[in-house]
Design a protein with these regions (language model features):
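Alpha-helical interface subdomain recognition
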Residues: 1-78, 99-104, 111, 115, ...
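Short Ser/Thr-interspersed hydrophobic loop/turn segments at strand-loop and sheet-helix junctions
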Residues: 50, 71-76, 186-191, 214-218
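N-terminal glycine-rich flavin-associated loop
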Residues: 83-103, 129-132
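A short, Trp-centered hydrophobic/proline-enriched beta-strand micro-motif
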Residues: 115-123, 167-168
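Flexible, small-/acidic-enriched active-site or ligand-binding loops
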Residues: 134, 189-219
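A structural signal for short hydrophobic beta-strand segments in well-ordered beta-sheet cores
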Residues: 137-140
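A short core secondary-structure module
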Residues: 149-194
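A short, charged helix-loop
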Residues: 209-236
Length: 382
């Protein structure tokens, strides 16, 4: 395995940057974030270019993750929220490819690949977060399918037009709690489903939603995989998801550093540029070093994924490093740029609010460190 990028990755990076300059310029991204607008044309063009096709092949025999981290890092330079939407579609398409029937792929994957639909996931509940095995939303068998009742929270992108949720519900059965879960494919406009947008500090482009399910009648064909396979689907999904969102965070960190370096070189105080003061330059240099180290961690996890090797620990470490770094670098940038970085016609407010949630998505730091500790053989709590 090698963490050295190839000419193919460099060409892809150049292509993505040119694409984003046309379809997601900085001014437009700020407007989308401020107004909570979903850029439908952007994601239609992403679908047209075939970027989703990366996950519809045999991802154990190619450079699936290696290509995706390049895509996600470049998109992350524009917005980590755009990466979140990209990831939702990619992860959902991969789930459909690995677990879905031909009918499900035709019904749910084909519209996404055509840019006409979106995918989301619904796991968290008012009283259930990191402990996904404890979900209380229930799916009970009916004569011709399933009846679902429950509530989901913090579902990104679930209220977007044409969205389909991968809904995690309890189907019963014996054994451990995690063995009683299943995943259902549920269009958000299905009878009995109510979706409400939750006012949030960040992630305004994708939107964060709560979902109410009242006697939702689903056909048997809505079940993804088999009853009891929900935990396995989630576990597999989360590995590549962490790799993708980590690379997106690093793209955002790189953008924040670039903005702040430019500001420090241009802004003068007491007769000198801010970049002449070590109180400014040394913290920025440390962030740059941490960015390079975190990028190595992401690339290592991607290499292991593409080699078919276990990478749960590696992807968790990558997510821990990148999430912490995005939160801390955006806060540092706000401090250095002062009032200039606080006003809304600047990209920093978006990065700062999205950087805060970067610590939490795909597992908060405490849960990640607990998992890493147990992988070391320590008797960590849980």
């Amino acid at each position: 395995m090698s963490t050295i990028r190839t000419d193919e990755h460099d060409d892809l990076r150049t292509t993505v940057r040119a694409f984003l300059a046309r379809y997601a310029p900085a001014h437009d991204v700020r407007i989308w974030d401020e107004s909570g607008t979903y850029p439908e044309n952007l994601f239609r063009e992403i679908a047209r270019l075939g970027w989703y096709d990366v996950v519809t092949g045999d991802d154990t025999a190619d450079e699936t993750a290696g290509l995706l981290i390049t895509l996600c890092e470049e998109i992350g330079r524009a917005s980590s929220d755009l990466v979140a939407l990209f990831n939702l579609n990619l992860s959902g398409l991969r789930d459909l490819h690995r677990w879905g029937t031909p009918e499900q792929r035709e019904t749910y994957a084909a519209p996404v690949l055509a840019g006409a639909a979106r995918l989301s996931i619904a796991v968290s509940e008012p009283d259930v977060g990191s402990d996904a095995a404890s979900v209380t939303t229930r799916a009970e068998r009916s004569a011709d399918g399933w009846i679902v009742n429950g509530q989901k929270t913090y579902c990104e992108g679930a209220g977007l037009p044409g969205a389909v949720m991968e809904l995690v519900a309890r189907v019963g059965g014996g054994g451990r709690k995690r063995d009683q879960l299943a995943v259902f494919l549920v269009p958000v406009d299905h009878p009995g489903v109510e979706v409400r947008r939750m006012p949030a500090l960040g992630r305004n482009i994708s939107g964060i939603y709560e979902v109410f399910l009242r006697d939702v009648a689903l056909p048997a064909t809505a079940l993804l995989g088999a009853p009891g396979q929900g935990w396995q689907i989630l576990k597999e999904r989360l590995v590549l998801e962490r790799i993708m969102i980590s690379s997106g965070f690093l793209g955002s960190v790189a953008a924040v550093i670039d903005l702040t370096v430019h500001y420090a070189n241009e802004r003068e105080q007491f007769g000198k540029a801010l970049s002449a003061y070590q109180g400014v330059t040394l913290p920025l240099a440390e962030m740059f070093v941490r960015l390079d180290a975190a990028r190595c961690a992401v690339r290592r996890s991607a290499d292991r994924f593409d080699a078919g090797l276990p990478c749960e620990v590696e992807s968790t470490m990558a997510k821990y490093l990148s999430g912490q770094l995005y939160a801390e670098s955006s806060a540092l940038a706000m401090q250095i740029q002062g009032a200039y970085g606080y006003v809304r016609d600047h990209a920093l407010p978006m990065h700062h609010s999205d950087g805060i949630i970067a610590r939490v998505v795909a597992g908060p730091p405490s849960v990640q460190l607990d998992f890493i500790a147990r992988s070391m053989g320590l008797g960590a709590s849980r």
